[in-house]
Amino acid sequence: MADNDFDNVTEECFTSTKSFWNFPCAHRQYRHEGNCHLIHGYSRSFHFVFGIKSFTKEGFAVDYGDLKELKAHLDHMYDHTLVLDEEDPHIDTFRKLENAGVCRIRTHPMGPGMEGTAHYLCEWTDNWLRKKTRGRAWVISVEARENDKNSSIYTNPNAGFKGWTG
C-alpha cells in the first residue's frame, strides 16, 4: 500500500468481484451414502467478492493484476487434483496412489464439497488479501461452483475493516 492510500479512504460501500473458471479436479464425499462417496470430478469455478476501506492510488478497489498469487493457489489446489476430507478413512490408500504418481491429493478440513471449499478459500484469501493490502481490502464472500447447477456461498463473518496493518 502506498503512503497516499490513507488519503483514499472511503466511507461508501464499494465492492469488487473476481471470478476464476475451469479448474478440473475430482473429489469424494466419504460420508455420503449415495454416489457422491465415489470419486467424481467437475470443472470448478470461484467467485470472490471483496470489500475495501480505501482505493489504491490508481483508484482501484482491488487491482486484478495483483491477484496472481491467488490464481497460483487455485491452480495448486484445484488443477488436476483430488480433493479429500482430511478425515477420509482411506486417506492412506490415496496417499499411496499419490506417491506412485497417480494423483495429487489436497485436503480440506471442512470436506471437499463446495461448502468446505468456499469456507477454505474465504479464510485463505481473506488472510492473504489483508496482509497484501495492509488491511485495506478483505473478502466478503466466496462462491464455489462445481457445475452450472450447483454452488455454495460462504459469507465471511469477519468481513470489514479491522485496522491498518504492517
List each model region and its residues.
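Charge-rich, low-complexity N-terminal segments
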Residues: 2-166
